[in-house]
Amino acid sequence: MTEQTVTEQIASAKTFSLNLRDDGVGVITMDVAGESMNVLKAAFADEIKALLDEIRSNKNIKGLGIISGKADSFIAGADITMLDGCKTAQEATDIAAMGQQMFGQLEALNIPLIAAIHGPCLGGGLELAMACHGRVATDDGKTVLGLPEVQLGLLPGSGGTQRLPKMVGLQKALDMMLTGKQLRAVQAKKAGLVDAVVPKSILLEAAVKMALAGKPDRSKAVKLPFVGQLLEFTSIGRGILFSQATKQTLLK
């Protein structure tokens, strides 16, 4: 088999597969061909659109879970070569807008979509997970969640800056986005970023159970200590937070 043939097979391979279980939960498996870890690429847009069309048209699907086909990686982020290939700011903006649109469609699904996370869930991977209606993560040391774009001189471009503060509060969200700090699964659960932490052996079943239970109730605000409430829910407090964030950004 020639190198060209292998390249062509990788290019034509599907990244997302949908398997409908007997209990009515559809399991979406993401497995990027030719990559040791899953990364997000603009080239997946048409495949994701077709997948969403298939899901919407199948009335037998009661819920969804999305899991990685890689052994020790959920989604490590956006494809760096794709970002490096941007010649203009508009090209980068277009990629971010595409991500926002796709994740917005995931969030708008009328059936529960649960992310089953094992391994690195970073950058665009976390943005995708936050667009899901629930998140289950393994207690494995390989599982970390974060938005490390700042380490590349970037900010999250596909909804992370809007969704993260709603889940963990503005103060922690700014800290994560401006430092690239990554959270272990237990830390992420304590912060409100994931709903459950389970052993890897029952990850998929835990996600399926959550999907069958319906969309989690997100009406309750993030629980914050008194000082945190002053900082986040008063104009003076938010001014202090943004002032600190500005100073931190200028130090980069």
Q: Can you annotate each of these PLM segments?
A:
Residues 134, 175, 179-181, 196:
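Well-ordered beta-strand positions
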Residues 1-67, 104:
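Conserved CoA-thioester-binding segment of acyl-CoA-metabolizing enzymes
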Residues 100, 105-152, 156:
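Glycine-rich beta-to-alpha active-site loop
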Residues 2-13, 42-46, 52, 172-174, ...:
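Intrinsically disordered, low-complexity segments enriched in small/flexible residues
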Residues 68-102, 121, 151-153:
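Glycine- (often His-adjacent) and acidic-residue-rich active-site loop
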Residues 161-171:
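Hydrophobic, secondary-structure "cap" segments at the distal end of domains
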Residues 66, 79, 128-129, 188:
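Hydrophobic/aromatic residues within transmembrane alpha-helices
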Residues 105, 128, 163-164, 175-176, ...:
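Hydrophobic/aromatic ligand-binding patch that stacks against planar heteroaromatic rings
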